[in-house]
């Protein structure tokens, strides 16, 4: 067995070494003379071909399509069954800071409870009506008192607790429904509001009336980020509990979003520019242009205002669902954005221009005249701390990794492999073949090496792609990597099978030998109080009988009780 394990171990080591090898790995670069004497003593410096992005982890929360996965301006990204009907409900995974609902030509706040009983339709808002159990609005202090026996809820931050509270209530008419109410959290007053209505926009003379005097007509409303909503956060049932780590909140000062292109963060070339007097206005503009799940068409039957009025007065969900609990986007277009839209912007504080774009940013450019913002971000809060050491730290990590690989595989140690990072606040670490250029607007004192040929470029759709002349190298490397991975998987699978077969053979042989070993235990035979199945020794004599004739074939016998 030890030999088998040694063989398997050596095979695994061989496969690991094969997996680590680079497809275009060059032989040792030691140069010899005619007499085989080493001429080069200085280590050779070369540039790695691997294109890694030091911003990858930092920028994960700004991948809004992945982190939020639903509309922002209007969030109706999920369907829920209630009874026999399908409703659209908010489903975003991140809070939308500063978002509220404006009821046009009305002084009523959307956080006012919906109209019930004899109230006029326009006297109410969107919030949950009064109930026997006071569940909304409710302060965070009272929420923590309410759930003090639940340690898991007590660990949640205020926004997560508000969302969880609102999502804990089910429809009376269908307790098995996945329908859950959205919520709004007031950070100034520390109050949690449950929203009775999931709809966020209803516009157009065909569907609503802006006439403030007509109190019983359907009111018009739309989402907005204005100054009165700065302290609010709109929450769906899907907001993650650790949203601080996974979602953007503060805008990024001294920064603008960019695209990582083979060693440097470059500006996004294709953008929409809009004049904006300040950051708040730019944030509001990007919110208006952001991902939206709002349907573009509605069913013609949405003109029966009397039915909707009665629905509110009688608290009849079936009557009001056409307007406020949208049934499959009003049975016309069930559009879901999945978070795709103009969700990002760079605000130029000097020229007062807001640059919008719909491509996921992959890095940050350090620029003292810019602020990077998103449609999810707070309208005013700014974090001015730029991670100045990110490039230097990544270069040191990459070089330590290369050094370990060289030591492990006995690669020529007279070789230094530099990572493909051409920007840093440590000019000497760039090892640039030309004089590095100093970035004037940088608050981090960055230098960039512009004389190394880039292997990637930005296309017209703001996507980064490898240049044609280098594609074959990376395709070959990817193919080799897949082949090596396949070899490793095959090797591991084969090794497991060999170990299993060897183990089975070993234990079967051991069990077989144990049976024969009992033939040497003649002294124990014939004891009247013992009942065992044993192999009969040819010299044994049971119960006064003569010896057995067979001296070659052991026989399994059972001793009777006396």
UniProtKB/Swiss-Prot annotation:
Quote the InterPro entries the UniProt record gives. Answer: Apmem_Ag1 (IPR003298), Apmem_Ag1_dom_sf (IPR024056)
Q: What is this protein called?
A: Apical membrane antigen 1
What family, per the record? Answer: Belongs to the apicomplexan parasites AMA1 family.
Disulfides per UniProt: 94-247, 162-192, 208-220, 265-363, 282-354, 388-444, 432-449, 434-451
* Xref: SUPFAM superfamilies: Apical membrane antigen 1 (SSF82910)
Main location per UniProt? membrane
Q: Which SMART domains match?
A: AMA-1
Q: Does the keyword Transmembrane apply?
A: yes
Q: Where is the signal peptide?
A: 1-21
- Entry keywords, A to Z: Disulfide bond, Glycoprotein, Malaria, Membrane, Signal, Transmembrane, Transmembrane helix
- What is its biological role? Involved in parasite invasion of erythrocytes.
Q: Which residues are glycosylated?
A: 84, 176, 226, 405, 441
Q: Which residues lie on this side of the membrane: Cytoplasmic?
A: 508-562
Q: Where are the transmembrane segments?
A: 485-507
Q: Which residues lie on this side of the membrane: Extracellular?
A: 22-484
The record's subcellular location field reads: Membrane
What is this entry's stated membrane topology?
Answer: Single-pass type I membrane protein
Q: Does the keyword Heme apply?
A: no
Region span, Disordered: 519-543
Q: Which GO terms describe its cellular component?
A: membrane
């Amino acid at each position: 067995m030890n030999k088998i394990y040694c063989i398997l171990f050596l095979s695994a080591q061989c496969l690991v070494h094969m997996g680590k090898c680079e497809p275009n790995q060059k032989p040792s670069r030691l140069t010899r003379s005619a007499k085989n004497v080493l001429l080069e003593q200085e280590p050779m410096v070369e540039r790695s071909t691997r294109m890694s992005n030091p911003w990858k982890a930092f920028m994960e929360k700004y991948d809004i399509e992945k982190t939020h996965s639903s509309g922002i301006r209007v969030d109706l990204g999920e369907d829920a069954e209630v009874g026999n009907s399908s409703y659209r409900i908010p489903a975003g995974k991140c809070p939308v800071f500063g978002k509220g609902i404006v009821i046009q030509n009305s002084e009523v706040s959307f956080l006012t409870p919906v109209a019930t009983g004899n109230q006029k339709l326009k006297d109410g808002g969107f919030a949950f009506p009064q109930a026997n159990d006071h569940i909304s609005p409710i302060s965070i202090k009272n929420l923590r008192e309410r759930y003090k026996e639940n340690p898991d809820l007590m660990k949640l931050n205020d926004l997560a607790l508000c969302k969880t509270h609102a999502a804990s209530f089910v429809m009376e008419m269908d307790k098995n429904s996945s329908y859950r109410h959205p919520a709004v959290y007031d950070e100034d007053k520390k109050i949690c509001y449950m929203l009775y209505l999931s709809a966020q926009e209803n516009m157009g003379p065909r569907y609503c009336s802006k006439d403030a005097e007509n109190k019983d007509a359907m009111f018009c409303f739309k989402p907005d980020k204005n100054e009165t909503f700065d302290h609010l956060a709109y929450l769906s049932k899907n907001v993650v509990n650790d949203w601080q780590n996974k979602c953007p909140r503060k805008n990024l000062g001294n920064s603008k979003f960019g695209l990582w292109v083979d060693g440097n963060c470059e500006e996004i070339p294709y953008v929409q520019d809009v004049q904006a007097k300040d950051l708040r206005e730019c944030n509001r503009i990007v919110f208006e242009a952001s991902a939206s799940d709002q349907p573009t068409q509605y069913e013609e039957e949405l003109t029966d205002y009397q039915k909707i009025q009665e629905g509110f007065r009688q608290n009849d969900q079936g009557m009001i669902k056409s307007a406020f609990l949208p049934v499959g986007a009003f049975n016309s277009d069930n559009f879901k954005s999945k978070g795709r839209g103009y969700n990002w912007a760079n605000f130029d504080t000097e020229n007062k221009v807001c640059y919008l774009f719909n491509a996921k940013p992959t890095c940050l450019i350090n620029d003292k005249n810019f602020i990077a913002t998103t449609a999810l971000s707070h309208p005013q809060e700014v974090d001015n701390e730029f991670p100045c050491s990110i490039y230097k730290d990544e270069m040191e990590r990459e070089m330590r990794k290369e050094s370990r690989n060289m030591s492990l595989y006995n690669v020529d140690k007279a070789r230094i492999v530099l990572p493909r990072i051409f920007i840093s606040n440590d000019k000497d670490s760039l090892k640039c073949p030309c004089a590095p250029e100093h970035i004037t607007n940088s608050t981090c004192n960055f230098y960039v090496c512009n004389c190394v040929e880039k292997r990637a470029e930005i296309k017209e759709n703001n996507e980064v792609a490898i240049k044609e002349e280098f594609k074959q190298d990376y395709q070959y490397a990817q193919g080799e990597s897949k082949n090596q991975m396949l070899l490793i998987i095959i090797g591991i699978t084969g090794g497991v099978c060999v170990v299993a077969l060897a183990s089975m053979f070993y234990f079967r042989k051991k069990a077989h030998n144990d049976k024969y070993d009992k033939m040497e235990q003649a002294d124990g035979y014939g004891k009247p109080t013992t009942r065992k199945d044993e192999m009969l020794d040819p010299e044994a004599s049971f119960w006064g009988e003569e010896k057995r004739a067979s001296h070659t074939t052991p026989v399994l016998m059972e001793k009777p009780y006396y």
